[in-house]
Amino acid sequence: MRRIVLSSLCLLFWPSHSWSQAKPTLSPAVSVFVKEDAPVVALAHVRVVDGTGAAPRQDQTLVIADGKIVALGDSAVTKTPVGAKVLDLTGRTVIPGLVGMHDHMFYPSPGGGLPLYPEHASSFPRLYLAGGVTSIRTTGSLEPYADLELQQAVDRGKLAGPKIHVTGPYLEGEGAFALQMHQLKDAEDARQMVEFWIARGATSFKAYMNITPDELAAAVKAAHAHGIKVTGHLCSIGFREAAALGIDDLEHGIEVDTEFLADKKPGVCPNPQAAAKALLAVDIAGKPMQDMIHDLVAHHVAVTSTLPVFETSVPGRAPLDGRVLDAMTPEARVAYLTRRARVSDNSATSDAPGIFKKELEFEHEFSKQGGLLLAGLDPTGYGGVIAGFGDQREVELLVEAGFTPVEAIHIATSNGAEFLGELDKIGTLAVGKMADLVVLEGDPSVHIKDIEKVELVFKDGIGYDSAKLIDSVKGLVGLR
């Protein structure tokens, strides 16, 4: 408390002109969405959920200057600097900006035929930011040059969007289902691919379903030599084997772990229906699952939760969100609703409800045992999960998995920042950190659905109008 009060007192006597440090020039394409850009902004009388997992603090004042949090404490003792713009946020809550850890820039093309995933560089950056997501990892790229150029455009103030950590192209073996994926020839090909994309700016890599153990080992070795992490959506390789090979993160959780299939062949992706049946028979409290969790924790392997995309496979379960439908093109909307109806028609024979329930249990158990659980949405599947809105749904589903709302917010903010090596800058609300934060109507620590009630999103101290961002991309998802 003493440090917070001193920070506030310093502000009282600091000349107002000392806050006039030049800000990045924002293009008209970005400034149209800006609602708050005063040199000093005070968020007064606001409830704070700081992302650390600590209990909410009532009636706080948070002061932003030069893109950073410069004071935070009880409103009674945290004075507002002279000349600051004061926002009375009574009844509202501020949380750290979400850190999306499975947040692609592509979306499934409607219409059937060949599986194609066009880049959504127009709509998705704005939707992520509108949803309160201030940093993302793309976790697999199908148009890596587009992702890298988009990252630079956002950083330079040319386009509105979150801070982007670009994952390189998929490291996929023979048998890729999408034409946009290169199929690795051997371990040397994997090494060369990693080296090539690190040189061009990729900051992580994602191994995919048909990668061989030798290819994964080569990719991990090459990436780690540069201090770069590797994650994976695996099928050919089980979680324990991947941990032994040095992988840093595993996507989706046990929904995709095939190691429990008794007759699985080494290095081969088995029949998904058979793998699902095997998983249904596994007890989360049983020795095989507990041994796997122990191995992941011992090897410091994180797990990225992507509950929203799997929820859409459970008949009648995913909410029919009007915001999502409004964002879609008519063709994308029809394609999504058609597939959704088909899923419901198969409810009598679906294994998805049982698998989804088991995934919820696994994620809670993994975290309870000390595993680092991350949060993302994965805007793929059959199109029911889209940027920003899906990230909010992920937080809600973490609560359903057994976490408290405050714990779920911690997972979706601080944990992601920790994995990215950015926790000293983002992920929690504290003096000295970047002012990446979200103003919500209501109290998500009591009603987690209030995570959807985004009013303002601050990134580097600039406050963006969530509603304007959403309105600007209506009817674009499914196209661009």
Show which residues each predicted segment covers.
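Bacterial N-terminal signal peptides
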Residues: S7-S16
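Boundary at the C-terminal end of the N-terminal hydrophobic targeting segment
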Residues: S18-A22
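Histidine-rich, glycine-flanked metal-binding segment
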Residues: T25-P28, F33-K35, V48, G53-I95
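C-terminal helical cap
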Residues: V46-V48, T349-A352, F356-K357, L377, ...
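Metal-associated gating/positioning segment near the N- to mid-region
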Residues: T93-K158, E174-F177, H182, E188, ...
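Divalent metal-dependent hydrolysis catalytic cores, especially in the metallo-beta-lactamase
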Residues: F124-P144, P162-P169, I198-I211, K229-T231, ...
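Active-site neighborhoods of metal-dependent hydrolases
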Residues: M193-K206, I211, V256-A401, L476, ...
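C-terminal cap of metal-dependent C-N hydrolases
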Residues: V431-V477
